[in-house]
Amino acid sequence: MRRLQREIRTYDEEQLKQVREELTTYDLMTRNALLQTAHDLRAKVEQEAVPEGEQATTYLKAVVDDRRHELSVFLPATQASAALENVRRHLVNQILSIGGKAKKLETERCAAERHLKRPTVEVVQREHDAHLRRLRQWQEVQSRFQTWHTYEQAYARWPDLAAAFDSGPTEAATRVATELHKRTLATMQEQDRWREFLRQATEQEHQRQLTPPEDDLPEDDLEEDTWAAAESSEPSGSLFSRLGHTLSRLMAPPGPDEVPSAATAPRETDGWDDVQPQIAPDPRSTVPGLWDDADDLTPVSPVAPARPAPSPPVYDAAAVPALDIDFSAAPRRSRTPAEQMPDPFARAARVRSARRTTTPLVPVPQQLDAAEMPAPRPARTPPGRPATAGNVAPPSAPRTARPPSPTLADFDLWDDEEDMPFGPPATPAPAAASVPQMVPTPRAAARPTPRPVSSPGPSPVPVSPASASVSHAAPWEEPAAGRPAPAPSGVSRRGATRLALPSEQLLDPLPNGARNTVQMDLDAERRGDMINETLRQFGLQAKVVDLARGPTVTRYEIEPAPGEKISRIASLSNDLARALAVGGVRVEAPVPGKSVIGLEVPNAEREPVTFHQATANPAFKNTRAKLPIILGKSIDGSMMVGDLAKMPHLLVAGSTGSGKSVCVNTLITSLLYRYLPTELRFVMIDPKMVELTPYDGIPHLVRPVVTNPADAAGVLLGAVAHMERRYKMMSQVGAKNLEQFNAKMRAVGEVELPHLVIIIDELADLMITSPKEVESAIMRLAQMARATGMHLILATQRPSVDILTSLIKVNIPARIAFAVSSSHDSRTILDTTGAERLTGMGDMLFYQPGLVKPLRLQGPYISEAESARITDELRRMMFDDDFIEAYGADFEGMISSSGPGGDRSQLDFSDPLLRQAALVCIEEGQGSVSRLQRRLSVGHARAGKLMDLLEAMNIVGPHQGSKPREVLIHEADLPEYFGK
């Protein structure tokens, strides 16, 4: 460069003129090349859209907006229609996604065309990269829409077919529902073949109902004398015994010439083969011959299932027509043929009902041996009703085949449990010498086994095989003698664990995104047109040039014409709110970094922002902040993560119900998810006694949550003393901040000092109780505690000047403002207006040094159940607390207002642990409330009262701030105070 400068100095006027001309020519060539490149790029941008994008937008309008498409019609919750409804919802969600993507790409393409009208090198480079990115996304839209269109065409006329399946046989509806779930596209494309299948299944069902096996039915003209003879021949017994004896004679196996044909023969099964744990019966077994091939839907002639024929043949109970027996005194009215098909057993039932006598049932024994209990079966699902967890039992052990026998014991008369008043017999039937008496037992098989409820947590306790193999009695049975009662399933004892960060499994699952995202975008665009119309009505030359939709509000960027004043647009905030039919709008004039005015309008529907979403966001996972705290989601969709170490203190204020307490819980949980108790400690002060007390007992606390405002002032003064103690320790090793001090401690193998965060949930109560002490302690901590790793988080719902004094505000520059009632309160918190126009429910304005203006965020929501699971998991963690051992006495503060400084006549010296507490202090060589808590296993309040009693007895000295209490006696002097 210097050489060129020396060379230029040697040029004369002619040479300089020539150089200027060359530079002008070069600049002109560069400009022409830039314009040509921008022109070519703009032509490519105009042609980058694919026809499928416009088609997707058209379908989106027809399905969502106009609702004139077949996909806009909801289907009923029956079997086949419910399966098709799942397909319909999937297709609607897909077109919402595809159409929304196409609209977004089209918006970006139009914006790129506008930018390329005034090209620069930066604009051309940026738009070229964006053009390549959009080309890939257009190809994705094209591919996804073509696939969706294939499904949409196959969906046509299927709602009517699904309704026909629901009106037909249950097995057919179950089959088509299963196939729609497994092979969606292939099933919908085979519409004609499915219609033929429905026709065949309907005909077979109708034929099966009209032509029952004739050889198995009794003669219609059965005389009463025949039944009388049958009754005289059967042994005396209960009603069920006589009924079983009669059925055994009616269902005697036919001869070789009496076997029904294969077309009408019932299936040989025990009644449970076609019941699956979670899937309805497969029509391949219920409609034989129609599903020989999974891919071939061509109906074939029905044939009998290929099974080894037993000798002699055994009839299934499901093939026996159900007996319509009335147990009332009066005989049941026979139904007309219009109501039901003629029942060949009706006359026999009426004869037996008239001739039966009342027989007492055999009582059920109190205890049944485990070997006599039948194996549990899965509960049968009623036809046409999907299987649920409530009526499905887990699969049992394989059933052993029973030897064929023509007696009643071979027939499973309990197959249809919903028609019988009791469950299966408790004991197997004896030999055919006599007809057994059927004892009604509780329906053990109909009760599904309850699933074990797993406790939330990242490390569930495994169940040993031995415990898993123990057979439990039924819920209504007493445990057998000599056998201990089994423990409830799913209840596991959870012991202490090692230190570990909380798992994301403790949080609620991630919520689904807003389903009507495209509709919300369309509403936002319509509001932009309304804003332009309103500005035009008031004679303002300005228009909306861009918008950004956030979770709570949408920011419209308004570009005023040259010469238009910003104040005129800002003064129309109430008129714009009226035109948009919203509660209020916030004007940000101008938007930092842009030459536009921001108009923030509340959304009609909020998008959920949860703490789980925030922790899963890369902004929190990959942050380099020393003390990362999750603040919320901005309007542009980015997650804002702050650094408490840089703030270094934070003020949170807002009216009741605005989200202040949830924000404090979010800040605390953010730190709990990043730091162990050895790295971060808390001091929590909660005068309201309801907000921070759920955190009581976690290992991060230096002392229990302070709820007494009188004690809070002493705790804050103790924190000041601890801060001074840290400064002395740092000065001794030559460290300027906590990081340098801990680095030196690691080098010599000493214990490091953790960060300390002091949280005050309601500052107003403390300022009313002891304003001077609290304000002076907060002022000193805010001024000096940053270098020692101590930070303050103050929260209040009374943002008045007597609570947030000038001294506190000057030393706490980082602030969060929630919705307040007036602009005066907003100025008290932020020194500017805007918080009075917030919408509540976590809508906040955040400001810290370095920001030009407050940033609007939507705070994440964390439920009380999530906080409870996290704190329960943390309370189980055990570790050697060296920090409390060394510095716990610094935070004792004022324990009780009736302590040594008060009226000693009110003290109760009858505590049985008083002598033991004195002995602990003598053994330790110093008096410490935390040591009394640990050694005596008592709470903080009782340990503090014991320390006050010892001070009143002159056994220990008075409280000395950060120093431990001095012990004034020896062990040999204890008899003088407590006797021998």
Curated annotation (Swiss-Prot):
ATP binds at G654, S655, T656, G657, S658, G659, K660, S661. It holds the Pfam family FtsK_gamma. Residues 636-827 form the FtsK domain. PROSITE patterns: FTSK. This is Uncharacterized FtsK-like protein DR_0400. It comes from Deinococcus radiodurans (strain ATCC 13939 / DSM 20539 / JCM 16871 / CCUG 27074 / LMG 4051 / NBRC 15346 / NCIMB 9279 / VKM B-1422 / R1). Although strongly related to FtsK, it lacks the typical transmembrane domains located at the N-terminal part of FtsK. Residues 464-484 have a biased composition (Low complexity). The keyword DNA-binding applies. It comes from the Bacteria. Belongs to the FtsK/SpoIIIE/SftA family. Residues 375-385, 395-406, 449-463 have a biased composition (Pro residues). InterPro entries: AAA+_ATPase, FtsK/SpoIIIE/SftA, FtsK_alpha, FtsK_dom, Ftsk_gamma, P-loop_NTPase, WH-like_DNA-bd_sf, WH_DNA-bd_sf. One of its GO terms (molecular function) is ATP hydrolysis activity. Residues 201-292, 366-495 are annotated as: Disordered. Probable DNA motor protein. May track DNA in a ATP-dependent manner by generating positive supercoils in front of it and negative supercoils behind it. Residues 213-226 have a biased composition (Acidic residues). Keywords: ATP-binding, DNA-binding, Nucleotide-binding.
